[in-house]
Amino acid sequence: MLRSVATVLLSAAALPALSESLNHTTGTDGLLLIDKLGGHVRFFDPATLAERSSLELPKNPHDFALSADHRFAYVPIYGPGIYNRNPEPGHELYVLDLAERKVARVIDLAPYRSPHGVQVDARGMLYVTAELDRKILVVDPQAGRIVATIDHDGAGHWLAVLPDGSKAYVANKDDKPFVSVIDLATRKQIGTVPMPRGTQGITASPDGRRVIAMDLAQPEIAVIDTASDAVLERVRLAGTTDPAYKAYYSPDGRWLLTMAGSSISIFDAANLSAPQRTLKVGASPMGIGFSADGKTALVANHGDGTVSAIDIAAATITTTFKAGTGIETLTYY
């Protein structure tokens, strides 16, 4: 079911020069912040870091994907709860016009519930985890409907789609001790990658050769080779005893930043065994966005309603600013 709330139609998305940028977004036009605890999406000026406007959404938005041309953002509505405790699950996907900073349309995902993670492929198809129904929804945002569903053996919370659109890797939290591997051409699960203590966040490298899965119970990441779907190595996060949470590659593939507790670890993405640089940020960091020049990372401190700006090369915090109530994730666009 599609409820149109604007007359604008979604045109075919223009593909970027490098398809690997689709789920590693950046830009210079604006900042999009998903204020989960505040029930809003917020638009900031990327130069001044001041808020331009905001939109109230149903409770609660957690994640986003952008169209290839950065005209639209796609935001699933998870519900007012959290993982495994979400008694009023959401069932909508909001389409936001980034230039106009308004809701363009709402796609109803019912009967599927608790949509959480979302990724986009080079054809413009969206892949959305429907946690309570243990499915991946394939959504055509131009048609405004679900075009297919994919069964897999886990609940599914976050997912990572490879840049070439061949496979998706699904993090199953504590529901199953593995990452589900999905063939997106056949829309079938084709394997699993062992994660004995469960999986928190998950991300693919911009070149598609690696997937990073975050250990749910330990300060450790698993490095998955996407050719073999085997774990190449497990890397301990320095300077923390907290479990790993999420990881983000910079769009140029140079850096990998991870979060655990209130710590950020900065890796040289080409050599994850090299010494890490760590620094403390605000409470419960959850999301990271990268500036277009690759120099700055913005860290959403979900636990205290702030965002920390990091000079990546220097591994220092340059400023911390107030933003909403509890930002889960964010991006430049």
Where do the protein language model's features map onto the residues?
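Predominantly soluble domains enriched in secretory-pathway, periplasmic, or organellar proteins
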Residues: A12, P16-Y333
